[in-house]
Amino acid sequence: MSVPRFQKINFGAYDNYVPVSELSKKSWNQQHFALVFPKPPRPGKRRRSKPSLLQENTSPKYDAEKLRGDRKQPLWMHRSLMRISERPSVYLAARSRHPQKETPPSQEDAKQAAKPSSPKVKKSKEDKDKSDSEAESIVSKEKPRKLSKAKEEKPDEKKDLKKERKDSKKGKESATESEDEKAGAEKGAKKDRKGSKKGKETPSDSGSEKGDAKKDSKKSKKDSKGKESATESEGEKGDAKKDDKKGKKGSKKGKESATESEGEKGDAKKDDKKGKKGSKKGKESATESEGEKGDAKKDDKKGKKGSKKGKESATESEGEKGDAKKDDKKGKKGSKKGKESATESEGEKGDAKKDDKKGKKGSKKGKESDSKAEGDKGDAKKDDKKDKKGSKKGKESATESEGEKKDSKKDKAGKKDPTKAGEKGDESKDKKDAKKKDSKKEKKDEKKPGEAESEPKDSAKKDAKKDAKKDAKKDAKKDAKKDAKKGK
């Protein structure tokens, strides 16, 4: 049989005995105490930081319940105990009573409340009711009166509004008419500015014009000085500004003078709108060919030796000043060619215009002996620039009749006439036909650009034959237009 635990054991010579339970309890208590209450660090020593110490203390934590050996109470017991403890004791002497709810009043009390407390109160209530009803009746009577007044006022207001609207409409119509007239005037001014490119001087004047071109360019920048004659139109004054804008878009061809007929200005307007950047056709000039001015400027740039000559006479058009500005900008892009003499016929000028559209690369026809000498020098350089920008050609000489000067004045007075619509339609048709023919001819010329430059004489002959037929028709139409405008 096993020896009971607490039984004394004899080891023979060793009479000392220690009960097992006491030894085990001691050792366990010591270990537990050391774990729970570690020794405080001594003041003089520093503890090394070991990795084990750096970690959290992983020693087991013992709950008080485990130490006691007690088990947890069941949940239902715990909850019930907690509830009872929260509630105050039922047997407390001073118990707090809940405030009693007011009982609803009985039927007898309600009847007594319904009865009036005194006859005075009744009378005062009746008086109030009467005053309220009277006030309501007065208000109700006043409302229809106001409505009737408002109705009477409304038709009056409507009539006034209608009158004001009619007046405003009339004012608007008059304003629109005046605006239309203003717009017409502005459009006319714009068209004159765009269309009226000034003529160019003949080569015989080129020597004096070299100095004049420089002087004009400086003068026009500061302010236009009174050199124009009384016959100059206001359109010419705007030409200087517009010519600067047009010089940016593309090279414009022959320009009109102030003395040109309005019909020719209309042609220039349409050409500006349709082409905008394309080459503009040759127009009649009053005194100069602009091409020679370009030559004069080139000579000035090359030599810078020419002396500045006498100022222009009072009859010089201000357009020539604008031409000087244009020449400054155009001289950068390319030189202008093809100058015609004062004795050239209008048929040859029409030929020059058509040749310009057909080839834009081919040789220029019917030049004067002086203009040929100047043109041939720059041909090699200019031919490259012609393809891109288009050569400037065909300018009429100063042999225009004074009758055209009178026509220009009449045309300016009749700018706003609506009868020009028919003439514009005819001109637009002619231009469309001309464009179709030109486009076909340009395609042919583009295929043979070298031949056109190398054989200018052959192309000139062919062009002359084709142009001779077309010139007769165009001249007849222009004369008809001029006659129609003179009749106005």
From Swiss-Prot:
Keywords: Cytoplasm, Cytoskeleton, Developmental protein, Differentiation, Repeat, Spermatogenesis
Region (8 X approximate tandem repeats): 189-407
GO biological process: cell differentiation; spermatogenesis
The keyword Repeat is annotated on this UniProt entry: yes
Biased composition (Basic and acidic residues): 62-73, 124-133, 149-189, 198-215, 223-246, 253-274, 281-302, 309-330, 337-358, 365-482
Any one cellular-component term (Gene Ontology): cytoskeletal calyx
InterPro entries, per database record: CYLC (IPR026189), Cylicin_N (IPR029354)
Sequence repeats: 189-212, 213-239, 240-267, 268-295, 296-323, 324-351, 352-379, 380-407
Tissues expressing this chain: Testis.
GO molecular function terms listed in the Swiss-Prot or TrEMBL record: structural constituent of cytoskeleton
Pfam families, sorted: Cylicin_N (PF15241)
Renumbered residue ranges of the record's region Disordered: 34-488
Subcellular location: Cytoplasm, Cytoskeleton, Perinuclear theca, Calyx; Cytoplasm, Cytoskeleton, Perinuclear theca
Organism domain of life: Eukaryota
Region (49 X 3 AA repeats of K-K-X): 25-487
Function: Plays a role in the establishment of normal sperm morphology during spermatogenesis. It is required for acrosome attachment to the nuclear envelope, and proper manchette elongation and disassembly.
Name under which the protein is recorded: Cylicin-2
Organism: Bos taurus (Bovine)
The encoding gene: CYLC2
